[in-house]
Amino acid sequence: PLYSSAASDVYKRQTKAYEADKVSIFGGIVATNRTVTKEAAELMKPIFLEIIMAPKFDEGALEVLCTKKNLRLLEVDMEQGAVDPKQYVSVNGGLLVQDLDVETKSVTADMCVTAAKPAAEQMDDMNFGWHIVKHVKSNAIVVVKDGRTLGVGAGQMNRIGSAEIALKQAHAAGVTEGLVLASDGFFPFDD
């Protein structure tokens, strides 16, 4: 995932994600677990997108989006029970089959071992970031604030490089304070 957000409807989610990075979405894929409304479709229409995935598109959304050339709309059952519980990866000379990691445990205040205790909003951002970072590949770092990703760093030889990328993106979005950072592993030094 490049940019993600949490909000009560697709329009608000899309607005928050788009405001975080207006460049990376170009030619991208939008996936949501809520119905795409006409209002959300009108926001997405001017953006070059390859695919929009959602459990449903309302009639107004279809009217708006079906006029776009080369855009594929996919209605997908987003319930966890609809997902194949196995993951298949092709490897040289074979096939790796493993259980799909669909569970994400929530971070709770009693897990916090620092002297400074996070506010409720920071706990929400920690859980949001934790749910996103598990889908980012290799030395993953996600920077979050107010229920949206502001920076994503991945694919670097070390997490410090990924963190630098993610923080640079957050700063480019104009946010420099109150950030929450989620990582898929440990840093090579004490925080």
At which residue positions do the language-model features occur?
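Short, basic/aromatic recognition patches
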Residues: K117-V136
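A structural-propensity feature for long, helix-poor, extended segments
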Residues: Y18-K22, G27-T35, G178-D191
